[in-house]
Amino acid sequence: MSEQPYYETMYILRPDIPEEEVDSHLKKYSEILEKSETEVLDSQMRGKRRLAYPIAKHKEGIYVQLSHKGNGQQVATLERAMRLSEDVIRYITVKQDGPLPTPKPTSKENEPEKEEVKPTEEKTESPSKDEKKEDSKE
């Protein structure tokens, strides 16, 4: 076998857990991957976001993303640990074809610049209301 495949795991934690617990979950799942001789490439906390539909009576969730490279056996171990955790409300692992692209930081600099639209002054042929009033007074 030439090179180990790349994987990306995204999981959603309950929104009511404290930030320290979120960090402990991230460390816990990274350690599970390292014990299975898997290289953890990247881990990102995506933050609290609104869910598309309620999951276990939660309308929001804390999104966390793990990118790793391994032989594939680590996925079952990782997903089993997530399934047993009460704090994880949803998870998914996707096998990537090649190396994962490095995510770009989200900031206002990366947003396309909006061009300022200056209103053009157009004169109409019909007289305005003010002009009509002036004409009627004369």
UniProtKB/Swiss-Prot annotation:
<protein>
    <recommendedName>
        <fullName>Small ribosomal subunit protein bS6</fullName>
    </recommendedName>
</protein>
<keyword id="KW-0687">Ribonucleoprotein</keyword>
<dbReference type="InterPro" id="IPR014717">
    <property type="entry name" value="Transl_elong_EF1B/ribsomal_bS6"/>
</dbReference>
<keyword id="KW-0699">rRNA-binding</keyword>
<comment type="function">
    <text>Binds together with bS18 to 16S ribosomal RNA.</text>
</comment>
<dbReference type="InterPro" id="IPR000529">
    <property type="entry name" value="Ribosomal_bS6"/>
</dbReference>
<dbReference type="GO" id="GO:0005840">
    <property type="term" value="C:ribosome"/>
</dbReference>
<dbReference type="GO" id="GO:1990904">
    <property type="term" value="C:ribonucleoprotein complex"/>
</dbReference>
<dbReference type="GO" id="GO:0006412">
    <property type="term" value="P:translation"/>
</dbReference>
<dbReference type="GO" id="GO:0005737">
    <property type="term" value="C:cytoplasm"/>
</dbReference>
<dbReference type="Pfam" id="PF01250">
    <property type="entry name" value="Ribosomal_S6"/>
</dbReference>
<dbReference type="GO" id="GO:0070181">
    <property type="term" value="F:small ribosomal subunit rRNA binding"/>
</dbReference>
<dbReference type="InterPro" id="IPR020814">
    <property type="entry name" value="Ribosomal_S6_plastid/chlpt"/>
</dbReference>
<dbReference type="GO" id="GO:0003735">
    <property type="term" value="F:structural constituent of ribosome"/>
</dbReference>
<dbReference type="InterPro" id="IPR020815">
    <property type="entry name" value="Ribosomal_bS6_CS"/>
</dbReference>
<keyword id="KW-0689">Ribosomal protein</keyword>
<feature type="compositionally biased region" description="Basic and acidic residues">
    <location>
        <begin position="106"/>
        <end position="138"/>
    </location>
</feature>
<feature type="region of interest" description="Disordered">
    <location>
        <begin position="94"/>
        <end position="138"/>
    </location>
</feature>
<comment type="similarity">
    <text>Belongs to the bacterial ribosomal protein bS6 family.</text>
</comment>
<keyword id="KW-0694">RNA-binding</keyword>
<dbReference type="InterPro" id="IPR035980">
    <property type="entry name" value="Ribosomal_bS6_sf"/>
</dbReference>
